[in-house]
């Protein structure tokens, strides 16, 4: 039964007119009705809240709402298959990432007369991955050049991926690709693989930050296809991963002042040629002609006034490793000359990363610009 609110002793009492008996009866009825309605409302809210909670759990496993490829519907009971949400493929950052990776692969394989147009369609059989890894690592793999059957393709892919994983030295849980996923043209697995390769070999490219893909996980339960969606991160903070998270003047030049960047390049070319001309050497392309480390080593000898014994470095390096050793040796000579350890990695220079090369040469210019 509804009760009257307790009166505060601080509030002065005011005369209250007496209500007729019939009004008291009405108040009692309305009070009961109000209590019933309140309880019903509360029960309804609880029911709605419970339904909302159940929907949050069950909706990810609701029947799929878009058309699947016929092959993706041929699942055994409880079998699980993942695929990219078709709507996610149109994401601008994902499109940018795929374009950057395709352009990078085509640049690396320009001498092989290989042109990649679609990552999933062109990389699934292992042929392009083999050529890409051989170029990056300067190592020939012992695999068949051409494979037609699915079994032969998977065997080749197995060998290529094992070699890649051995080189990358990633912990098992960080390896998000395998023979089956790559051969099945799983875009998520292929992107993870290419991003890992580009970061390990310090590819001279800029991957877009924080690229994610909406992945649909399809499962067959009691004869019905059900799905749930998860957000798969492909790239995080790519500058932090590559060790270039501290922005400097060269980041600003590249991003906002390409005209001034050309002036800096011409200044550095003039500076290095002033000294390399003494050996009848000349530089026209900064990013490529310093990539094997030879000119860097010779330049340090000229700037410091000593002869670098030819047995100390590879005069004609023919592998990625030898080029890295040359650049590392040049970095040691720079530190011996009083310079701080260069921020770029030797691999950055070998991979023709222009920004990294400019950083190294500008440090030399700052210290030795008055040397004749």
Curated annotation (Swiss-Prot):
Region (Required for interaction with TESK1 and ILK): 223-372
Region (Disordered): 1-31
Keywords, alphabetical: Acetylation, Actin-binding, Angiogenesis, Cell adhesion, Cell junction, Cell membrane, Cell shape, Chemotaxis, Cilium biogenesis/degradation, Cytoplasm, Cytoskeleton, Membrane, Phosphoprotein, Repeat
SMART domains in alphabetical order: CH (SM00033)
One of the record's GO cellular component terms: lamellipodium
Keyword field contains Phosphoprotein: yes
Protein family: Belongs to the parvin family.
Complex formation: Component of the heterotrimeric IPP (ILK-PINCH-PARVIN) complex composed of ILK, LIMS1/PINCH and PARVA; the complex binds to F-actin via the C-terminal tail of LIMS1 and the N-terminal region of PARVA, promoting F-actin filament bundling. Interacts with TGFB1I1. Interacts with ARHGAP31. Interacts with the actin cytoskeleton. Interacts (via C-terminus) with TESK1 (via C-terminus); the interaction inhibits TESK1 kinase activity. Interacts with PXN/PAXILLIN (via LD motif 4).
Protein name, as recorded: Alpha-parvin
Natural source organism: Mus musculus (Mouse)
């Amino acid at each position: 039964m509804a009760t009257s609110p307790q009166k505060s002793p601080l509030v002065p009492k005011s005369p209250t007119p007496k209500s007729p008996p019939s009004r008291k009866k009405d108040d009692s009825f309305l009070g009961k009705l109000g209590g019933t309605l309140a309880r019903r409302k509360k029960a309804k809210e609880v029911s709605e809240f419970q339904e909302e909670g159940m929907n949050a759990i069950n909706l990810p496993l609701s029947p799929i709402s878009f058309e699947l490829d016929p092959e993706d519907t041929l699942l055994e009971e409880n079998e699980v298959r993942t695929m990219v949400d078709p709507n996610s493929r149109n994401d601008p950052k994902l499109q940018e990432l795929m374009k950057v990776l395709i352009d990078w692969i085509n640049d690396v394989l320009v001498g092989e007369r290989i042109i990649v147009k679609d990552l999933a369609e062109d990389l699934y059989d292992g042929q392009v991955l083999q050529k890409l890894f051989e170029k990056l690592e300067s190592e020939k793999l012992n695999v068949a050049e051409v494979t037609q059957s699915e079994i032969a393709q998977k065997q080749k892919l197995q060998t290529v991926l094992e070699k890649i994983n051995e080189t990358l030295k990633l912990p098992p849980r960080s390896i998000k690709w395998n023979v089956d996923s790559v051969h099945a043209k799983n875009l998520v697995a292929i992107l993870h693989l290419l991003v890992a390769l580009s970061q390990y070999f310090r590819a001279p490219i800029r991957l877009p930050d924080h690229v994610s893909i909406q992945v649909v996980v399809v499962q067959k339960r009691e004869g019905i296809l059900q799905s749930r969606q998860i957000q798969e991160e492909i790239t995080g903070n790519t500058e932090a991963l590559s060790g270039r998270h501290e922005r400097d003047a060269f980041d600003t030049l590249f991003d906002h002042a390409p005209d001034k960047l050309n002036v800096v390049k011409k200044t550095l070319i003039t500076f290095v040629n002033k000294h390399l001309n003494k050996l009848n050497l000349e530089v026209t392309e900064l990013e490529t002609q310093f990539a094997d480390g030879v000119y860097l080593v010779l330049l340090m000898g000229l700037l410091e006034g000593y002869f670098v014994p030819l047995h100390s470095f590879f005069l004609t390096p023919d592998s990625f490793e030898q080029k890295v050793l040359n650049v590392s040796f040049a970095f040691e000579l720079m530190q011996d000359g009083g310079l701080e350890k260069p921020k770029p990695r030797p691999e950055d220079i070998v991979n023709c990363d222009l920004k990294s090369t400019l950083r190294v040469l500008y440090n030399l210019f700052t210290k030795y610009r008055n040397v004749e």
